[in-house]
Amino acid sequence: GLGDVYKRQGMGLDKRIGSRFLRAGPAYGGSCFPKDTKAIISTADKFKTNLSVVKSVIKSNENRSKILLDRIYQMLNKKVKNKKITFLGVTFKANTDDMRDSSSLKMIPWLSKKGAIIKYFDPTGYKNEFSKLKNVTNKTSIKDAVQNSDLVILHTEWNDFKSINFKN
């Protein structure tokens, strides 16, 4: 069969869909989509209509952080404590400072509680959300964020991250 990239490109050719929202990411978030999908379900329930596809989308999105945390856990050989983990981007999507329902709000606290040493860089300079967490540091540059990391997570697809040279 076709690979995911080709499927995405094909679907994106349809102007009603477009390609902008067909890229893989940690989960959807923000102020609109989570609220809107829940409102659709609420309205459907009032009219006794089962929208199983929308319910599945919500459930799948809620599970994304757990799935990604499990992958991180496996990549680090089930040893998260004292591992240096960098998040590049913490907002729910690029080109915004919106943190609402960002999967980083679930992932970073969980990793911090497990003893990981978290560094993050976001082009917005965002730093308030994690300031009270142990072992979580906001960095002011990509280089400072990724230096000496055991694992780098590209969380948000900012253009700033497209040309990173990890060799330097």
Predicted segments, located by residue:
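Structural/interface elements that position substrates and couple domains in central-metabolism enzymes
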Residues: 1-168
